[in-house]
Amino acid sequence: MLEPLTNPQIRKFKAAAQLLEPMLKVGKAGLSEGFIRTVSATLDQHELVKIKFAEFKEQKKELAPLLAEKTGSHLVMRVGNVMVLHRPKPEA
């Protein structure tokens, strides 16, 4: 279980996300198991991941928190058709 993010952490992650380009896109397959695995692997490498909704734009309010839950990450923000997830890197 992840610890909730503090307000200073949220501000820090939002600022860092401004500089990121979307790394992944939610496409026609939606939140398939393969996409969820890809997001999880990307979070393992980068901690902070920006994802764009290319499809399913009408359901983004429901899908964003669902993706965060399925990947064990925090939904830092969702603005327009973009969301940002954060998960600390696993300790080696």
Predicted regions and their residues:
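Positively charged, polar, low-complexity stretches
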Residues: 1-92
